[in-house]
Regions:
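Glycine/Thr-rich phosphate-binding loops of Rossmann-like dinucleotide-binding domains
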Residues: 14, 64-66, 135
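Short glycine-rich, Thr/Ser-proximal phosphate-binding strand/loop in the N-terminal lobe
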Residues: 2-40, 44, 73
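Short glycine-rich anion-binding loops that position phosphate/pyrophosphate groups of nucleotides
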Residues: 59-62, 130-132
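Glycine/GP-enriched mid-protein hinge/lid loop-to-helix segment characteristic of carbohydrate kinases
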Residues: 17-20, 26-29, 36, 92-94, ...
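Conserved A3 ("GATE") glycine/threonine-rich loop of ANL adenylate-forming enzymes
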Residues: 11-12, 107, 131-133
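Glycine-rich phosphate-binding loop and adjoining helix at the ATP-binding site
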Residues: 62-123
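Short glycine-aspartate micro-motif
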Residues: 3-7, 51-55, 100, 124-128
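Phosphate/pyrophosphate-binding loops at sites that engage ATP/ADP/AMP, CoA/4′-phosphopantetheine
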Residues: 18, 40-54, 61, 95-99, ...
């Protein structure tokens, strides 16, 4: 099974294709620019790759509430051009596959809990230091 992943970071996007074992089969990164240019790079990477599902971890703030009318949006970010951008809408318009959306920190912590150093542990802490400092507790 081929799975797609996007780390939508404030300075760069990392896109990859992996499998259910957590193995990375293909990976690329590019600078975060205006949404149109950045998403063009995302689409260029994934088009024709026949991925079966896609996970997105994004810089924020975001709206991850499935019941919200702005689910899938990057909301009140100071990042130029990205304020109230419907990133999941753009992806769903292009790809008819199951998708998940959360913060970049939650995505990274979930990856560590599922495939990384926290796999099999009852508890773990994930600390990220960037524009802000976030501590994630499992």
């Amino acid at each position: 099974m081929k799975l797609g992943a996007i780390e939508a970071g404030g300075t760069k996007f990392v896109v990859c294709i992996g499998n259910e074992k957590g193995e990375v089969l293909e990976r690329e990164s590019f600078p975060t620019e205006a949404p149109e240019k950045t998403m063009e790079n995302v689409f260029k990477f994934f088009d024709g790759k026949e991925i079966e599902a896609l996970g997105v971890g994004s810089f924020g703030p975001i709206d991850p509430d499935l019941t919200s009318p702005t689910y899938g949006y990057i909301t009140t970010t100071p990042k130029p051009g990205w304020n109230n951008y419907n990133i999941m809408g753009a992806l769903k318009e292009r790809y008819d596959i199951p998708m998940a959306f959360d913060t970049d920190v939650n995505g990274a912590a979930l990856g560590e809990a599922t495939f990384g150093v926290a796999k099999g542990l009852d508890s773990a802490l994930y600390l990220t230091i960037g524009t802000i400092i976030i501590l994630w507790v499992l």
